[in-house]
């Protein structure tokens, strides 16, 4: 991203924060309906990667965690899409960074599984649980299984538990060895994984 684009993004982001600071993030659904905004509109804007529409809907009182009948929150969808701007808007509006879907996914798991390193970084900075697990596997295990060295480094730096075991006793190190990924294996051993 060029300097001009970065400056533009920061300007938009801080304007968004200023707008959101003036709106209630705990407004009731009737308040949102009174303004003509709905959770369905927010979810549609997030799915379409429409930053401005998301900002407008949040400023009109739509709650950032409104699921609109969907299994996922808007933050989870934005994380899956890799849209860091929308992720930051939703977080600034008070979205729950550790909310779980019915099947146990969180925004940080979805960002990591889709290879969105910058979004993972933003979510961790906002307090996402680095040791979250889903389906019996830790986030670190999921990242190691996918072979993503950079995200694994980030998770370890953020305090990911290198010793976490699945019900069958498998660790992240076992997964790295099974896929013959020597870089990940070395990283995990250096982080204290038992040989």
Features from the language model and the residues they span:
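Conserved hydrophobic residue in the first alpha-helix
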Residues: 42, 75, 108, 140, ...
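Conserved ankyrin/ankyrin-like repeat signature
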Residues: 53, 85-86, 118-119, 150-151, ...
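Ankyrin repeat boundary/linker residues
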Residues: 68, 101, 133-134, 166
């Amino acid at each position: 991203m060029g300097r001009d684009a970065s400056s533009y993004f920061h300007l938009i982001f801080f304007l968004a924060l200023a707008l959101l600071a003036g709106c209630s993030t705990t407004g009731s659904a009737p308040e949102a309906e009174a303004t003509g905004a709905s959770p369905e509109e927010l979810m549609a804007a997030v799915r379409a990667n429409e930053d401005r529409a998301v900002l407008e809907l949040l400023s009109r009182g739509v709650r950032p965690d409104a699921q609109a009948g969907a299994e996922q929150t808007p933050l989870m969808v934005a994380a899956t899409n890799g849209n860091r701007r929308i992720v930051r808007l939703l977080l600034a509006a008070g979205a729950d960074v550790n909310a779980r879907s019915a099947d146990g996914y969180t925004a940080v798991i979805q960002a990591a599984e889709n290879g969105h390193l910058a979004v993972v970084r933003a979510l961790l900075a906002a307090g996402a649980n680095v040791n979250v697990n889903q389906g019996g596997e830790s986030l670190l295990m999921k990242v190691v299984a996918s072979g993503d060295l950079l995200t694994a480094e980030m998770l370890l730096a953020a305090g990911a538990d290198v010793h976490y075991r699945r019900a069958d006793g498998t660790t992240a190190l076992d997964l790295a060895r099974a896929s013959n990924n020597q870089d990940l294996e070395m990283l995990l051993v250096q982080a204290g994984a038992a040989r």
